[in-house]
From Swiss-Prot:
Pathway: Purine metabolism; IMP biosynthesis via de novo pathway; 5-amino-1-(5-phospho-D-ribosyl)imidazole-4-carboxylate from 5-amino-1-(5-phospho-D-ribosyl)imidazole (N5-CAIR route): step 1/2
Protein name: N5-carboxyaminoimidazole ribonucleotide synthase
PANTHER family in UniProt: PHOSPHORIBOSYLAMINOIMIDAZOLE CARBOXYLASE (PTHR11609:SF5), PURINE BIOSYNTHESIS PROTEIN 6/7, PUR6/7 (PTHR11609)
Organism listed in the record: Vibrio cholerae serotype O1 (strain ATCC 39315 / El Tor Inaba N16961)
Record EC number: 6.3.4.18
Transmembrane segments: none
ATP-binding in keyword set: yes
Role, per record: Catalyzes the ATP-dependent conversion of 5-aminoimidazole ribonucleotide (AIR) and HCO(3)(-) to N5-carboxyaminoimidazole ribonucleotide (N5-CAIR).
InterPro entries, sorted: ATP-grasp, ATP-grasp_carboxylate-amine, ATP_grasp_subdomain_1, PreATP-grasp_dom_sf, PurK, PurK_C, PurT/PurK_preATP-grasp, Rudment_hybrid_motif
A Gene Ontology cellular-component term: cytosol
Gene: purK
Similarity section: Belongs to the PurK/PurT family.
Reactions listed under catalytic activity: 5-amino-1-(5-phospho-beta-D-ribosyl)imidazole + hydrogencarbonate + ATP = 5-carboxyamino-1-(5-phospho-D-ribosyl)imidazole + ADP + phosphate + 2 H(+)
Length: 377
């Protein structure tokens, strides 16, 4: 079985690693260079996209911001999973919000903005504070503004106006500000015949809009809510593959914040913490194979490595620590890799996070230090 991944970053890399034991060969399309490359070595392979489409059995995607002509070309082959519709919804907040409404899953109240009058109407309808998000191209906290006070309206509008003028296809989604208790996410998979499996919820900690720490949690009531919402969205799309839903938890109730039609950063913990990791289950789903068990096998936390290309030796020396590097050139704030920390029980996992806080730099790993201070104030 041969799979073409649209995108050639770390998610394609980890899909390739997960596919090898199943005798699934992966190649990747680098959207920037428009080359077909090997996902691990980045070696350029000697054929173009159209030839690659003909030579593979399945096409999938590692991220949602793929040019629509490329998605449409792949969709015409009948080999693209998830569908172009699903991938496009993940890359456009207007489509995403419409999808959530059709699926009848709870999400923050919103309206669309293209003009100063639209902003005035949005403030009257939703009230302040509000969060303003770009419809296209926003991820990891980019393309977002927070409007808290009436005195900010003109200055924020000036920024929005410049942003909109630079891209005629752009729009702004105005959402009510949600005072959430915590952020959680659910990663699951749906296959060609409609079977669904979901992993345990993960509690997520973000730093400046970027995921820093993700921990698998046992929350039965929330898990039931999240699974029902996952199924509603997946069935609305007739989805095939791994799908992630990010939620705000507010007094025991969940609101969908975003969807990601792909394997997801908050699911990386499954590589060591679940019986079948998200990358393998994605390939199983899109290749027509039975889905694997999502059972938790060890208490697990995932720590993103941001902007660092080296770690202290003590990290690998700690029992239950697994490091995954992405092979990227070092750049400030860039996702360079992640650490999966596993333990037999939650208290042991907390102890290990505290140990890691003693050797990891607080500036680079603020979430680990914050958790350690909560555990051992």
């Amino acid at each position: 079985m041969r799979v073409l991944v649209l995108g050639a970053g770390q998610l394609a890399r980890m899909m390739s690693l997960a596919g090898a034991p199943l005798n699934i060969e992966t190649i990747a399309f680098d959207v920037g260079s428009e080359n077909i490359v090997h996902p691990l070595t980045q070696t350029v392979l000697g054929h173009g996209l159209e030839q690659a489409i003909e030579q593979v059995d399945v096409i999938t995607a590692e991220f949602e911001h793929i040019p629509h002509p490329i998605l449409d070309l792949c969709a015409r082959s009948g080999k693209l999973y998830p569908s172009a519709e699903a991938i496009k919804a993940g890359g456009d907040r207007r489509l995403e919000k419409a999808l959530l409404d059709r699926a009848q899953v709870a999400n923050a109240r919103y309206t669309m903005i293209r003009s100063r009058d639209d902003l005035t109407s949005a403030i009257a309808e939703i009230g302040l504070p509000m969060v303003l998000k770009s419809a296209l191209g926003g991820y990891d906290g980019k393309g977002q503004w927070r409007l808290k006070e009436p005195t900010q309206i003109e200055s924020v509008w000036q920024e929005l106006a410049q942003y909109l003028a630079a891209n005629p296809e752009q729009a702004i989604v105005a959402e009510e500000f949600v005072a959430f208790d915590r952020e959680v996410s659910l990663v699951g998979a749906r296959n060609l015949v409609g079977d669904v499996v979901v992993y345990p919820l993960a509690e997520n900690v973000h730093t400046q809009g970027v995921l820093s720490l993700s921990t698998a949690i046992d929350a039965p009531a929330l898990q039931t809510q999240a699974k029902a919402m996952f199924k509603a969205v997946a069935e609305q799309l007739n989805y095939v593959g791994v799908l992630a839903l990010e939620f705000f938890e507010v007094q025991g109730q969940l609101l969908v914040n975003e969807i990601a039609p792909r394997v997801h950063n908050s699911g990386h913990w499954t590589q060591q913490g679940a019986e079948t990791c998200q990358f393998e289950n994605h390939l199983r789903a899109v290749c027509g194979l039975p889905l694997g068990s999502t059972k938790l096998v060890r208490e697990t936390a995932m720590i993103n490595i941001l902007g660092e290309d080296q770690l202290p030796a003590e990290v690998l020396a700690l029992e239950g620590c697994h490091v995954h590097w992405y092979g990227k050139a070092k750049r400030s704030g860039r996702k360079m890799g992640h650490i999966n920390v596993t333990a037999d029980y939650s208290g042991e996992l907390q102890r290990k996070l505290c140990q890691l806080a003693t050797v990891l730099d607080e500036k680079a790993f603020p979430a680990v230090h914050a958790v350690a201070k909560e555990i051992q104030p």
